[in-house]
Amino acid sequence: MTSIMTNPAAMAALQTLRAINHNLETTQGRISSGYRVETAADNAAYWSIATTMRSDNAALSTVHDALGLGAAKVDTFYSAMDTVIDVMTEIKAKLVAASEPGVDKDKINKEVAELKSQLNSAAQSASFSGENWLYNGASAALGTKSIVASFNRSADGSVTVSTLNYDTAKSVLIDVTDPARGMLTKAVNADALQSTPTGTARNYYLIDAGAAPAGATEIEIDNATTGAQLGDMISVVDELISQLTDSAATLGAITSRIEMQESFVANLMDVIDKGVGRLVDADMNEESTRLKALQTQQQLGIQSLSIANTTSENILRLFQE
């Protein structure tokens, strides 16, 4: 039936054109933003998951930065410890040289004193971001230090942050308040280091940082120093080198662990990025193909609407005739 009030063909063509325009707008939005799920209205479930994953990735990025800072910090302490071991090896060599008959022990002692100053300087200079694990100028012990290691989200949605902990008692070289807390300021019993100890303590310390250990002798020599005393000093220095080596090995292990964790966090961030992309990213090849198809459909829809409107025009001509 032909009516002057209603044009069903035009109405159908108009509805089709509206649907095409809506799809075209959606496709153009995906191409311009790069996302097929940009807001919760697009897909509430995917948007919620992606938003949580992005939040976790931002936290992991902070953890990654903290690990990098921690690695640089431990590298600083390790480098200083390595320098200290080299200087201690020089001190041991000087003491061995002093054991030779006829040498001027006073001159050698001046060299040893300079090397001890280098030890003090190396320990004090091993500071990074306001922390120093080798030198303690405070009254309290440095205690345990923590480095952020990872960010974890459990199955129930709860969040935890784990840390790498290090007891600085293993690395403090100089303690100005309590010499017993520093490897180079504490007293070491030379008698206990002998293969056949006598049971009589002969305590020595290397550096006097302001509070020397009671009942101990500083490692320094002069022409009156006996061969037995030199032997004790060499044994003590050798023991300190062994302790320093163990401490450096521990720092090296911490560095290795941090680097492994840093690599893991970086890989985890990449995996999360890929996961988010699979949920919300638009397939640009698919969307560009759809865009061309919708543009063609839009043109056809406009033509269909134009054709549908010719019915009303034909009725108008009948009345005009």
UniProtKB/Swiss-Prot annotation:
Q: Which domain of life is it from?
A: Bacteria
| Main subcellular localisation | secreted
By its UniProt entry, which Pfam families does this protein fall under?
Answer: Flagellin_C, Flagellin_N
This protein's UniProt keywords:
Bacterial flagellum, Secreted
Q: Name one GO molecular function term.
A: structural molecule activity
Concerning InterPro entries, the annotation shows:
Flagellin (IPR001492), Flagellin_C (IPR046358), Flagellin_N (IPR001029)
GO-annotated cellular components:
bacterial-type flagellum; extracellular region
Q: Where in the cell is it found?
A: Secreted; Bacterial flagellum
According to its UniProt record, which protein family does this protein belong to?
Answer: Belongs to the bacterial flagellin family.
Function according to Swiss-Prot or TrEMBL: Flagellin is the subunit protein which polymerizes to form the filaments of bacterial flagella.
What's the protein name? Flagellin C
Taxonomic source organism: Rhizobium meliloti (strain 1021)
Kindly list the organism's lineage: Bacteria, Pseudomonadati, Pseudomonadota, Alphaproteobacteria, Hyphomicrobiales
